[in-house]
Structures are given as C-alpha cells and as structure tokens.
Amino acid sequence: MIDQNKLITKWKKAFAKAKNLTTLVNLKNTLHNSDLKPLLQKIKTATKLSEKSSLGKLYQSLDIQLTDLLTSYKKTFEINNQVSQKPSLDVMLPATEFTNGSNNALYQVIDNLVEYFKSFLFTINFDSELTSISDCFDLLNIPKDHSSRNESDSFYIDKTSLLRTHCTATTLKAVRTSKKTNNPDIRVVSLGAVFRNDSDDATHSHQFTQLDFMWIKKGLSLANLKWFINNMITHFFGENTFTRFRLSHFPFTEPSFEIDIRCWLCQNGCSICKQTKWIEILGAGIIHPQVMNNMGIGDTENITGIAAGIGIERLAMLKYGIDDIRDFYDNNFKFLTQFTD
C-alpha cells in the first residue's frame, strides 16, 4: 500500500528545488508519471470492484494534492520573483497627455441654433434623407418646369423619390402628419444633410447641412417673422448685428425674403461681402396658403405660418472665417482641432 505522507513529503522536497515556473510545471508532470500513473494501471487490472473503488479514491486524493502543491509553489515563486525584480515601468514619469475631443464646427453651430429653437418649444425633427417628389416639390408649390426638378440639379433614386434638396420637404411631412386642431400651434425644426447636383468648389458642395423651421399658429404675421429671425441672428452672432430683409421669391412662401447681415469686416465693401457691405445668410417668408392647405391646415385666413431655411456651413464659414466649404469634410486634424467648445 502507498504511504501518502511519505509520497507528499517527497513531492514537497522536489518542488522546493525548482528554479522557475517552467520547471515547476514539468516537475508536476514527471511526478504524476512516476508516482500516479502506476496507480492507474493497478486500477485497470484490479478484478474486484471494491479494490477498484479503493484505488480510485486514493488516486483522486493524491492527484488533487499534487495539483494543490503545484499551485501553492507557483504562487510562492511568483511573489518572490516580483519582489526581486525591478518594476518595468517608471511610475514617476509624467503621464501621456490625452487630447480632449470637441465638436466639429458644424455641430457647434447646430447646437447653438437648436438651443435657440428649444427655448421656444420647437420639436427637433430628424427624418430620412430620402424623400418623395411630392413632398420635395409638388406639395411645396414648386412648378413642374422649375430648374430644381431637373436631373442635372437633383439626385433621383427612381421616378418617385430622390435625395432631399432641402429640409423643407422634411418639415412639410412632419406638419402634414401631425395632429390637427382648430387652434393649432405647430413648431417644427428639421435638420440634416441635403443634396444638390453641384460641382464641389470653395463655396459649393453636392452635400451640405440645412436647418429648416415652420411655426404655424393663428395670428402670426410678418412682424413676428422679422422679430423671430432678428432674435435668432442676435443669439448666434451677438449684439449689434445689423440685418436687412430683401424681397425675394420662393414658391412655398408669400411674401418671401432673403435676410442679410451687415459685413463686420469693412465699412465700404470687401471681398467677403462682394463690395455690397451686406452678406446673405438665409431665406424666409410667410408660408404660402396653398402649401398650408397641402399640409392639412385649413382656415388660412386666420391661421398663418412663418418659415425659414438656413445653411449651416454658411453660418459656420461666416462665424469662424472659413473660406472653403470643403475644409469641413477633409478630415484635416489640424483644421478640426481649432474649434474647441
């Protein structure tokens, strides 16, 4: 019969002489083969069930003790090894400085404007960049022969759908599908990418970002539109920003205006304002009665709406003095890191 105490003492002496972890593992395998493997052979050749059971329990007990000894000596060896080794890292060296991230200049402009519209309880609406010809053109009163409908100006997907050319299509859809009442107060902002079939240059891009809003309510007038736009411009550009409303024409508003701000770089004209002393920033107007009807708004004698469309890149270029729209999309890290929140 095997003397367990004598065998374990032998194993301990053998493990104590090991010089490294590899030797410990190899030694465990050697001891198993020399001392426990013969026991397995006895189990196989035993003829009595009671003998097999007794030998099996003995083997299991010894195998567990051998494994526990290996684990114990490995821990001791690792602790001693850690104490004797010098740290591979000098913890007194200064840490690597992390670069703080910040929003892209376009998103800083968007956040500024969204903050303004939220203060007036507008719903911020994001929708698919794919729209129908009906929402993009027909319901917005845009004539069949208008140049924006041409395939040379827009990106058509099929005969009924295209990539939206303005966010007004998205705003119209939001208003059209909203719950209607006899006394509506609908405030919607649409925001996202729009697409025009333009050649990319310093001031044009086939894709850019637009913000569009509609406010529909009884009694809204041109005075409300002017106040709201002027207030938004002051919020964005700061006090003492002078504005000018010029009559224009958009199929979906009547009357229609283009809004300019006074050039802050010059007194008598410069290359930025093209010698006019004014810089165009957005288009706005009173929503056309036919468009109101198309959106399901009745009683256009009393219920009116104000609206505007704003190019985000244009505002960012003016605010930050950027002269090439392509800079926003070129992933130039030096350019992007100039704009910290």
UniProtKB/Swiss-Prot annotation:
SUPFAM superfamilies: Class II aaRS and biotin synthetases (SSF55681). Its cofactor is Mg(2+). Binds 2 magnesium ions per tetramer. Gene3D superfamilies: Bira Bifunctional Protein, Domain 2. Mg(2+) binds at E254. GO terms for cellular component: cytoplasm. Keywords: Aminoacyl-tRNA synthetase, ATP-binding, Cytoplasm, Ligase, Magnesium, Metal-binding, Nucleotide-binding, Protein biosynthesis. It comes from the Bacteria. GO terms for biological process: phenylalanyl-tRNA aminoacylation. Disulfide bonds: none annotated. Pfam families: tRNA-synt_2d (PF01409). It is found in: Cytoplasm. It is an enzyme of class 6 (ligase). It catalyses: tRNA(Phe) + L-phenylalanine + ATP = L-phenylalanyl-tRNA(Phe) + AMP + diphosphate + H(+). One of its GO terms (molecular function) is phenylalanine-tRNA ligase activity. Its EC number is 6.1.1.20. InterPro entries: aa-tRNA-synth_II, aa-tRNA-synth_II/BPL/LPL, Phe-tRNA-synth_IIc_asu, Phe_tRNA_ligase_alpha1_bac, Phenylalanyl-tRNA_Synthase. Tetramer of two alpha and two beta subunits. Belongs to the class-II aminoacyl-tRNA synthetase family. Phe-tRNA synthetase alpha subunit type 1 subfamily. This is Phenylalanine--tRNA ligase alpha subunit. It comes from Mycoplasma genitalium (strain ATCC 33530 / DSM 19775 / NCTC 10195 / G37) (Mycoplasmoides genitalium).
